[in-house]
Curated annotation (Swiss-Prot):
PANTHER family: X-BOX TRANSCRIPTION FACTOR-RELATED. UDP-alpha-D-glucose binds at residues 322, 328-329, 358, 499. This is Cellulose synthase A catalytic subunit 7 [UDP-forming]. GO terms for biological process: cellulose biosynthetic process; plant-type cell wall biogenesis; plant-type secondary cell wall biogenesis; rhamnogalacturonan I side chain metabolic process. Its main location: membrane. The modification N-acetylmethionine is found at residue 1. The chain crosses the membrane at residues 234-252, 263-283, 805-825, 837-857, 873-893, 923-943, 955-975, 985-1005. It is found in: Cell membrane. Its EC number is 2.4.1.12. Glycans are attached at residue 900.
């Protein structure tokens, strides 16, 4: 899609369009050659799935299947090059020492049931060719087929030599002839194999070797690898978890069998809370059983897909940026995000940036226009000097030596000029913001005098404007810029718009019509690209021929700027991103967290991952004790749908084709062009499509009624039903059998802003928790959804269940935080007097908790300070935001009372941490304040009671005081937040404190702790001699 001359606004019926030029036709890809075995010289061949056979996933040493199987059966079972033990691959028999792997599931080959004679015959034939040369001539390949390296990706094969077909250009390397032996005999094969092994170390490069052989071998190797946690770190951690589970069971048994008869209410409440905490701990702990890390190889990605002199074969990527309210999400923040996207280290023709303005704000539109103009200067500057990060606001405010590693003589001069250009750009944006603060009575007017179509934000047509791209002009150095598209979907009264999820689905459809990239990057407007190679990092997984087929998305961790040094309110959330997410990556992949995620478009369309040969389900029919019938899978997959469409023909075929097209329209909507794009797995727009028709369809697919009677939001795209649509969307993909990847490059891929103010932070946590409660009560709850097919792994289900259950922990947590004060005020306790033996249970439990935390920090690299801040805010958020989320969720489910969430403000104060000390009153502050005062009153009452009754009461008091102080210490950051910068409590909090203190003072007087508890004779009756 090319840059248009003006804004395109209209609905499906209005047909308001502008004329644009033809789209650039996609460049053809070249056919590429195959590979040959380093041992016998035979062609390596294909796997059972049609991919190039790779014997060793670690080094990619070229070996054909017969040599690979012989080495596993008769040899050392190790790769000749890297000495790594060969793993069993699909289509090969098992040997002693093989591990069970769920992805290799072919019983017909696994136990070597048949085809033994065929394999020996093929081996003998391969050796005959191996004596002659390192490859075959064109006459040996009857069909002219070459094994594709890019599985499920772009069409075309990977080059291993110069040309195709003749000896001069092909890969042609002489090898020493093997000793003559009967070609078909097993002994001859073994003799030649052993001879090759003995001579392998002495075979040096020949004079006529291809100089690119080293690069080719490097390009054949995997684009990424798993890095398991060292066994010395993870094994003790697992043993302590098991020990803690046993200790917890013994502790709970003791608690249940030893009630406190004079305080049954307190005892029963505490036991129920402890059981709930145990269940919550299990759901949180065991998904961290298999943590892994990953490494990517960007150089191999370039060697494989960016070969010199050939078309760039990296996959196109559509980038989505969403914004709603420019007053809470400043245009300057959004502009920096867009500029960092346009300046990414990725081919410009492969990048398209779509900005969704769900508030239909003219301020956002005009600021994006200014951003497009500034990008013509900023993008070439970034690429010329390779600066990081490529968001100008963050780059120019970095307090580092910006001259480090810079050798270009004009860098300083051009940097100063660019900084001045950016400052002028900021002034223009600020002027637009100031102008937008006063809305005219007649509404906004565009520069050409026409009214702004989005003056009524709840009733306006769809709008599209293409700012940059193929026909949008060039940068200051004459180079093309990535495409930049402004999108505002149509809104009309009476239609449900589904907030952010609906806006994202509209972007998916618009991009599907205009560019249709096979991959999509989703970013919030305040999350800029901090690592210009972030998309390349994701492509190392998504375009990997071995693992990319079943990957639905690559999730990056969230990192933040502008957080205070102590991270008072645990904004960095490193415990979740550096511990929990690594654990999930070892199971079925991390959950989707709403931003910083690269999706596979086909996964968002509801398709299932491609299926390889699977072991048949053993459903015995009674006629055979070993084998059964294969269970039929009635779920539709993309391959089935493509096959059905391709098989149609004749009169009946036309009828079936019509029915199939109607089914597609019921699924994807009534846009034939968009439906066609969903079947293009490799992406791209049909060359025959007219740009005017594409623009008309783009307006159509963002119309307010397009999703009616379709599966958008239920099975396709971002899933509706919760304000935390990210959890639901990732959950649906995992239930279909996809897996996700967690990518943590050394330089953080994306960075955003976090609410450092206490009230804003609690409101953010409230929104997340409310979304979890909505999912818990919906039909997509992990407790009962997704069991059919068994594609969601159990530990992954545990993790998803924990994401929906955790808000309910607020109820027992609140009760447990109040119990210490009640015990101090009533002089009772939740446990009976314990013996020396029983005290071992408590000591063991506390020790196991401490050791588990220490070992977890050891393998994850999280600091103890970050862990402690997370624990503190877990209590603060648990007794405030999570509690309110449960109440609001129940009101919404039971009474139908809906609660609208507010967008978290991204504005910054002139002071670096001005927002940190600002006090904003919210009802979320009431429960923690109440708990804090109750415990302080309880501590004072307990100490006064002990002083009044003598030293014999100090022993039992220490346990109660420790219990209460533990609660107060967890709430300390909350107390500092209430005090603010001036270390004085705001008036509203003082009023609440006095009110609550008065209530508990009356309660204290009723208990009367200063009066002697022992009863004696009445002096009025016995006289002075009593």
């Amino acid at each position: 899609m090319e840059a248009s001359a003006g804004l395109v606004a209209g609905s499906h019926n209005r047909n308001e369009l502008v004329v644009i030029h033809n789209h650039e036709e996609p460049k053809p890809l070249k056919n590429l050659d195959g590979q040959f075995c380093e041992i016998c010289g035979d062609q390596i061949g294909l796997t059972v799935e049609g991919d190039l056979f790779v014997a060793c996933n670690e080094c990619g040493f070229p070996a054909c299947r017969p040599c690979y199987e012989y080495e596993r059966r008769e040899g050392t079972q190790n790769c000749p090059q890297c000495k790594t033990r060969y793993k069993r691959l699909r289509g090969s028999p098992r040997v002693e020492g093989d591990e069970d792997e769920e992805d290799i599931d072919d019983i017909e080959y696994e136990f070597n049931i048949e085809h033994e004679q065929d394999k020996h015959k093929h081996s003998a034939e391969a050796m005959l060719y191996g004596k002659m040369s390192y490859g075959r001539g064109p006459e040996d390949d009857e069909n002219g087929r070459f094994p594709p390296v890019i599985a499920g990706g772009h069409s075309g094969e990977f080059p291993v030599g110069g040309g195709y077909g003749n000896g001069e250009h092909g890969l042609h390397k002489r090898v020493h002839p093997y000793p003559s032996s009967e070609a078909g005999s097993e002994g001859g094969w073994r003799e030649r194999m052993d001879d090759w092994k003995l001579q392998h170390g002495n075979l040096g490069p020949e004079p006529d070797d291809d100089p690119e052989m080293g690069l080719i071998d490097e390009a054949r190797q995997p684009l990424s690898r798993k890095v398991p946690i060292a066994s010395s770190k993870i094994n003790p951690y697992r043993m302590v978890i098991v020990a803690r589970l046993v200790i917890l069971a013994v502790f709970l048994r003791y608690r249940l069998l030893n009630p406190v008869h004079d305080a049954l209410g307190l005892w029963l409440t505490s036991v129920i809370c402890e059981i709930w905490f145990a269940v919550s701990w299990i759901l949180d702990q065991f998904p961290k059983w298999f943590p892994i890390e990953r490494e990517t190889y960007l150089d191999r990605l370039s060697l494989r897909y960016e070969r010199e002199g050939e078309p760039n074969m990296l996959a196109p990527v559509d980038v989505f940026v969403s914004t709603v309210d420019p007053l809470k999400e400043p245009p300057l923040v959004t502009s920096n995000t867009v500029l960092s996207i346009l300046a990414m280290d990725y081919p410009v023709e492969k990048i398209s940036c779509y900005v969704s303005d769900d508030g239909a704000s003219m301020l956002t539109f005009e600021s994006l226009s200014e951003t497009a103009e500034f990008a013509r200067k900023w993008v070439p500057f970034c690429k010329k000097f390779s600066i990081e990060p490529r968001a100008p606001e963050m780059y120019f405010t970095l307090k580092v030596d910006y001259l480090q590693d810079k050798v270009h003589p004009t860098f300083v001069k051009e940097r100063r000029a660019m900084k001045r250009e950016y400052e002028e750009f900021k002034v223009r944006i600020n002027a637009q913001v100031a102008k937008a603060s006063k809305v005219p009575l007649e509404g906004w007017i565009m520069q050409d005098g026409t009214p702004w179509p989005g003056n009524n934000t709840k009733d306006h047509p769809g709008m599209i404007q293409v700012f940059l791209g193929h026909s949008g002009g060039f940068d200051v150095e004459g180079h093309e810029l990535p495409r930049l598209v402004y999108v505002s979907r149509e809104k009309r009264p009476g239609f449900q718009h589904h907030k952010k999820a609906g806006a994202m689905n509209a972007l998916v459809r618009v991009a599907g019509v205009l560019t249709n990239a096979p991959f999509m990057l989703n970013l919030d407007c305040d999350h800029y690209v901090n690592n210009s190679k972030a998309v390349r990092e994701a492509m190392c997984f998504l375009m990997d021929p071995q693992i990319g087929k079943k990957v639905c998305y690559v999730q990056f961790p969230q990192r933040f700027d502008g957080i205070d040094t102590n991270d008072r309110y645990a904004n960095r959330n490193t415990v979740f991103f550096d511990i929990n997410m690594k654990g999930l990556d070892g199971i079925q992949g991390p959950v989707y967290v709403g931003t910083g995620c690269v999706f596979k478009r086909q996964a968002l369309y509801g398709y299932e991952p491609p299926k390889g040969p699977k072991r048949p389900k053993m459903i015995s029919c009674g006629c055979c004790p070993c084998f059964g019938r294969r269970r039929k899978n009635k779920k539709f997959s993309k391959n089935d749908m493509n096959g059905d469409v391709a098989a149609l023909g004749g009169a009946e075929g036309d009828k079936e084709h019509l029915m199939s097209e109607m089914n597609f329209e019921k699924t994807f909507g009534q846009s034939s062009i968009f439906v066609t794009s969903t079947l293009m797995e490799e992406g791209g727009v049909p060359p025959s499509s007219s740009p005017a028709v594409l623009l008309k369809e783009a307006i159509h697919v963002i119309s307010c009624g397009y999703e009616d009677k379709t599966e958008w939001g239920t099975e396709l795209g971002w899933i509706y039903g919760s304000i935390t649509e990210d959890i639901l969307t990732g959950f649906k993909m995992h239930c279909r059998g996809w897996r996700s990847i967690y990518c943590m490059p050394k330089r953080p891929a994306f960075k955003g802003s976090a609410p450092i103010n206490l009230s804003d932070r609690l409101n953010q946590v409230l929104r997340w928790a409310l979304g979890s409660v909505e999912i818990f009560f919906s039909r997509h709850s992990p407790l009962w959804y997704g069991y059919k097919g068994g594609k969601l792994k159990w530990l992954e289900r545990f993790a998803y269940a924990n994401t929906t259950i955790y808000p309910f922990t607020s109820i027992p947590l609140l009760a447990y935080c109040i119990l210490p004060a009640i015990c101090l005020l009533t002089d009772k306790f939740i446990m009976p007097p314990i013996s020396t033996f029983a005290s071992l249970f408590f000591i063991s439990l506390f020790m196991s908790i401490i050791v588990t935390g220490i070992l977890e920090l050891r393998w994850s690299g999280v600091s103890i300070e970050e862990w402690w801040r997370n624990e503190q805010f877990w209590v603060i958020g648990g007794i405030s935001a999570h509690l309110f989320a449960v109440v609001q969720g129940l009101l919404k489910i039971l009474a139908g009372i809906d609660t609208n969430f507010t967008v978290t403000s991204k504005a910054t104060d002139d002071d670096d941490f001005g927002e940190l000390y600002a006090f904003k009153w919210t009802t979320l502050l009431i429960p923690p304040t109440t708990v804090l005062i109750i415990n302080i009153v309880g501590v004072v009452a307990g100490i006064s009671d002990a002083i009044n009754n003598g030293y014999q009461s100090w022993g039992p008091l220490f346990g109660k005081l420790f219990f209460s102080f533990w609660v107060i210490v967890h709430l300390y950051p909350f107390l500092k937040g209430l005090m603010g910068r001036q270390n004085r409590t705001p008036t509203i909090v003082v009023i609440w404190s006095v009110l609550l203190a008065s209530i508990f003072s009356l309660l204290w007087v009723r208990i009367d702790p200063f009066v002697l508890k022992t009863k004696g004779p009445d002096t009025s009756k016995c006289g002075i001699n009593c």
